[in-house]
């Protein structure tokens, strides 16, 4: 975000508690308020409808907002704006008013968040046409995806699992990576393999493909330790657009597949996939 704000004066960052020195309750944007000032990094009222809805007006006058919904659980008051205005503006205006924005959403269960700070919302979001949804599993991917989202003309929602901030949880150490260069951009809609099964196990019919994303990548890696060379792990990185071709190739290769998600199974994105 710092690099984007340095390169683009039209880039703004706002949301609840992101201003001044704090940079969000998870400190992921700490000091940016001090660096760029209150006109470009600022706090908003506790009103998600305003945070999301304001991106329409900001975009219309040539600004490029990066906004934060403090927790995925709080996105519900903003869904009306996301569904009726942000996602449809391009279509309803015949291309005259695209809403180009990045909406960051810390998500997932972490620590003692309880019922109001632990939700996953990807199944709701993937049913909204007109937005793109990404869900990185490590710091390097997040940087590349953030750059791609910023330069994309469409509204992009970035889901960031709270348990992956700082790589503090046991088994998630690989979320901490060497920072890529400033021009590092990852195209949206491209999955990647993070673990490969051996050719021998595949030929024996003893291999399995796990399709997952976000925190699920690390749960899958832990489970794979019990099945030597038998597991292929596919990190989606992008939920929409979805890398259907690569998913199909992997599942066809193994003839066995598990879709791993944190959400309840019934009527979910994972079940649909």
PLM features: what roles do these ranges have?
Residues 1-159, 162-166, ...:
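Thiamine diphosphate
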């Amino acid at each position: 975000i710092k690099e984007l704000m340095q390169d683009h004066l039209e880039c703004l960052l706002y949301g609840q508690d992101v201003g001044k020195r704090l940079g969000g309750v998870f400190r992921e944007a700490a000091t940016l308020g001090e660096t760029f000032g209150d006109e470009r990094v600022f706090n908003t009222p506790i009103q998600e409808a305003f945070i999301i809805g304001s991106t329409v007006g900001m975009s219309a006058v040539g600004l490029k907002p990066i906004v934060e919904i403090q927790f995925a659980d709080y996105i519900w008051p903003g869904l009306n704006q996301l569904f009726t205005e942000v996602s449809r503006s391009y279509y309803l205006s015949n291309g005259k008013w695209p809403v180009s924005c990045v909406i960051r959403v810390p998500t997932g269960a972490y620590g003692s968040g309880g019922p109001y700070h632990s939700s996953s919302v990807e199944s709701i979001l993937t049913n909204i046409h007109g937005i793109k949804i990404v869900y990185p599993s490590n710091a390097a991917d997040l940087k590349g995806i953030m750059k791609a989202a910023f330069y994309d003309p469409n509204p992009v929602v970035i889901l960031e699992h709270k348990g992956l901030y700082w790589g503090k949880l046991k088994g998630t150490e690989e979320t901490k990576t060497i920072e890529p260069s400033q021009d590092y951009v990852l195209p949206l809609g491209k999955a990647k393999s993070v673990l490969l099964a051996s050719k021998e196990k595949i030929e024996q019919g003893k291999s399995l493909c796990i399709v997952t994303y976000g925190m699920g990548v690390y749960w899958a890696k832990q489970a794979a330790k019990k099945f030597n060379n038998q597991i292929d792990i596919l990190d989606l990185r992008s939920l929409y657009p979805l890398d259907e071709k690569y998913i199909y190739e992997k599942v066809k290769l193994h003839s066995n597949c598990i879709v791993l998600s944190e959400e309840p199974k019934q009527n979910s994105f994972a079940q649909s996939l």
